[in-house]
Amino acid sequence: MASLSHILVLWVGILTVVNAEAPQEHDPFTYDYQSLRIGGLIIAGILFILGILIVLSRRCRCKFNQQQSLGKMRSPHLAAQFSSESC
């Protein structure tokens, strides 16, 4: 009987070791945050440099005329109303 109990204990031990060494299934909800962080920093750096290049290029393709200043846009009638002649 002692040999049968030894065989059962040995068999249970072998089964435990075999189950422990079984390859783990890939968990789809495990993320690699280090790669995600590095990728985000690279994209942020590229967008930052692109923004600086756009600002420094001084090319704005806007629809309004950029050559008009605030002084030229004033009406001459408004300037006449506030002249010193009315005092």
Swiss-Prot record:
Protein name (Swiss-Prot/TrEMBL): Phospholemman
Gene (UniProt): FXYD1
Major location (coarse): membrane
Quaternary assembly: Homotetramer. Monomer. Regulatory subunit of the sodium/potassium-transporting ATPase (NKA) which is composed of a catalytic alpha subunit, a non-catalytic beta subunit and an additional regulatory subunit. The monomeric form associates with NKA while the oligomeric form does not. Interacts with the catalytic alpha-1 subunit ATP1A1. Also interacts with the catalytic alpha-2 and alpha-3 subunits ATP1A2 and ATP1A3. Very little interaction with ATP1A1, ATP1A2 or ATP1A3 when phosphorylated at Ser-83. Interacts with the non-catalytic beta-1 subunit ATP1B1.
Mode of membrane association: Single-pass type I membrane protein
Organism: Sus scrofa
Phosphoserine, modified sites: 75, 83
Statement: the UniProt record of this protein carries the keyword Transport: yes
Highest taxon of source: Eukaryota
Functional description taken from the UniProt entry: Associates with and regulates the activity of the sodium/potassium-transporting ATPase (NKA) which transports Na(+) out of the cell and K(+) into the cell. Inhibits NKA activity in its unphosphorylated state and stimulates activity when phosphorylated. Reduces glutathionylation of the NKA beta-1 subunit ATP1B1, thus reversing glutathionylation-mediated inhibition of ATP1B1. Contributes to female sexual development by maintaining the excitability of neurons which secrete gonadotropin-releasing hormone.
Modifications made to the protein after synthesis: Major plasma membrane substrate for cAMP-dependent protein kinase (PKA) and protein kinase C (PKC) in several different tissues. Phosphorylated in response to insulin and adrenergic stimulation. Phosphorylation at Ser-83 stimulates sodium/potassium-transporting ATPase activity while the unphosphorylated form inhibits sodium/potassium-transporting ATPase activity. Phosphorylation increases tetramerization, decreases binding to ATP1A1 and reduces inhibition of ATP1A1 activity. Phosphorylation at Ser-75 leads to greatly reduced interaction with ATP1A1, ATP1A2 and ATP1A3. Palmitoylation increases half-life and stability and is enhanced upon phosphorylation at Ser-83 by PKA.
Domain note: The cytoplasmic domain is sufficient to regulate sodium/potassium-transporting ATPase activity.
Annotated signal peptide: 1-20
